[in-house]
Amino acid sequence: MLNPTVRKFQYGQHTVTLETGMMARQATAAVMVDMDGTAVFVTVVAKKKVKEGQDFFPLTVNYQERSYAAGRIPGSFFRREGRPGEGETLIARLIDRPLRPLFPEGFLNEIQVVATVVSVNPQVNPDIVAMIGASAALSLSGVPFNGPIGGARVGFIDGQYVLNPTVDELKISKLDLVVAGTAGAVLMVESEADLLSEEQMLGAVVFGHEQQQVVIENINALVAEVGKEKWDWAPEPINQSLHDRIAQLAQTRIGDAYRITEKQERYEQIDAIRDEVISTLLAEDESLDEGEIIEIFSGLEKKIVRARVLAGEPRIDGREKDMVRALDIRTGLLPRTHGSALFTRGETQALVTATLGTARDAQTIDDIMGEHTDTFLLHYNFPPYSVGETGMMGSPKRREIGHGRLAKRGVLAVMPTIEEFPYTVRVVSEITESNGSSSMASVCGASLALMDAGVPIKESVAGIAMGLVKEGENFVVLSDILGDEDHLGDMDFKVAGSRNGVSALQMDIKIEGITREIMQVALNQAKSARLHILGVMESAISQPRAEISEFAPRIHTIKINADKIKDVIGKGGSVIRALTEETGTTIEIEDDGTVKIAATSGEQAKQAIARIEEITAEVEVGRIYNGKVTRIVDFGAFVAIGGGKEGLVHISQIADKRVEKVSDYLTMGQEVPVKVLEIDRQGRIRLSMKEAQATQQEAAETSSEDPAN
């Protein structure tokens, strides 16, 4: 007998319902979460046994949107959902990031979280709903999980923070920030902002964390009521004698190796020490597990580096805690691209290009929240050679999609509107070297490449990655972290922005006890680093180039009467197709009569504009046109006079004398001057060849009598 347990609570302006016990009863745990009509069904399956040889924690989070949730049938050929889209991948990462640090070290059992959107209210984003569901399902499952977590979206409208703003409210919000955390700690922040201050950003984080406590309280209450028994799990006991022996063999040498500033040389030295330790220990005792030796060795590395940082010693590459690595900036280095830049910060390097296209190059995104068009694209590629490795090349992985979206958030606030700059813009960041903070290098490179392309961005933006090492009350914030410092630290966060404020903030915290004061110190230190980088960038290029590249399309905009759109398009698109082919341009027409002509030369654009103006021009009574005979009939001839207009030259209006047979005077396709005599109420046009001839003759005689001639 199905006996669901339901819990309902108010969360800001929304009502949230948690329900369990109705569906997916063979899963370890399952929860249906509903927030005002947006419902996400979340399941957790956890393996009781660890796979043999497993040396990492195999947590998988899958997020999938079903078209039926929005009352639609998929538009694909097979009429069913395919592989996850970019949006689904980003939300899966958003859920994964705050959950992963809450599993105890040494827990290696496989866990899969599946979140399926089954109903959607177009005003309520499903990502926060899915995050709440994942937290609830894991908490109910009994697995060793130090949750639950809450999730909240924070907007900033009219100077006030707004909890879980609707889709319409987000359109007018200066902030879109998602924060997740436990009852006592913030774990994850993901945001984009319209150049807000550090204080406003931090205030939003604190506000969201405070407001989400109601979610945590209700999940705890649900667990108390129907939660499964906690697993009887404990970490493997520490082999202290092996720890001591490895420290004896390697501690001093590891410390010396981490004084080598060049990454590849340092890695080679560490690898050599590790291999020697493994060989020595296995020679002493063949029963030892190589995986355990490597794990203890890695822990010793982390301990040594952290102790040096906390003691105030120079960092791995010799820098002080607040120093940014050496910068090298070059722009315009690729001759045929529309804009390019090479941004190098230490051993991290990004080759970034900007390409300008027309409206038809925009990306149409059709998901369960509706269809929308994106005219600014930023793609991030991380090839294996950037870290001196070999590997598979193919479609972008989750990490590349996530880093690209973060970099895009960092630049979005300074991009011009489509009205200010009617181009689709694509930025591509190729990471050619990597040793920490390649996504923030992409922000810097994107800003430089956009300026090089002549895109009128409001101001330069730069990004910086920060780290934190904390033991007890002692903590050190590190600016511009290396890859090793990211791995060994307790918090890493990335801040992008201009001189006037923050455009993007991403934060991942691995420990509890990170206070508001620590985050404030970190944000202030990040601001100093960002301003330093901006200064160097502005010395390379301080404002967008006055002209776009000669290889980029020029977009010219004209306005026509909306009633004339059909004339420019023609039957079956015949007129506009001929226009584009004959002038070598791309023409786009909007419903309000706005016409955008993209051409690589000014002459092409002039030709297209002249043709369109000719087509859409109103026929004037008394004006003489050069027409073309399109049809000959017994009583006269029909003549096209441009603009898709055609008029009749009656047989009596062909010549001054009597005309017996029209074909004696006119042939098909013949070009003749005609004068508009009348346009009747039905729009029919009466033309005259003899009146046109008389008017032209009179004008010629007047001209010859003019003394100036």
Curated annotation (Swiss-Prot):
Domain of life: Bacteria
Entry's EC annotation: 2.7.7.8
Entry keyword set: Cytoplasm, Magnesium, Metal-binding, Nucleotidyltransferase, RNA-binding, Transferase
Top EC class, one word: transferase
UniProt KW Nucleus keyword: no
Residue intervals of the S1 motif domain: 622-690
Biased composition (Low complexity): 691-702
Binding of Mg(2+), residues: 486, 492
One of the protein's GO biological processes: RNA processing
Region of interest called Disordered, as start-end residue ranges on this chain: 690-709
GO molecular-function terms, A-Z: 3'-5'-RNA exonuclease activity; magnesium ion binding; polyribonucleotide nucleotidyltransferase activity; RNA binding
Cited SMART domains: KH (SM00322), S1 (SM00316)
GO cellular component terms listed in the entry, alphabetical order: cytosol
Recorded catalytic activity of this chain's protein: RNA(n+1) + phosphate = RNA(n) + a ribonucleoside 5'-diphosphate
Pfam families xrefs: KH_1 (PF00013), PNPase (PF03726), RNase_PH (PF01138), RNase_PH_C (PF03725), S1 (PF00575)
The keyword Methyltransferase is assigned to this record: no
Cofactor or coenzyme needed: Mg(2+)
Compartment(s) of residence: Cytoplasm
Record domain KH: where: 553-612
Family: Belongs to the polyribonucleotide nucleotidyltransferase family.
Record's subunit section: Component of the RNA degradosome, which is a multiprotein complex involved in RNA processing and mRNA degradation.
Listed HAMAP family: PNPase
Job of this protein: Involved in mRNA degradation. Catalyzes the phosphorolysis of single-stranded polyribonucleotides processively in the 3'- to 5'-direction.
Listed name of the protein: Polyribonucleotide nucleotidyltransferase
Organism, as annotated: Proteus mirabilis (strain HI4320)
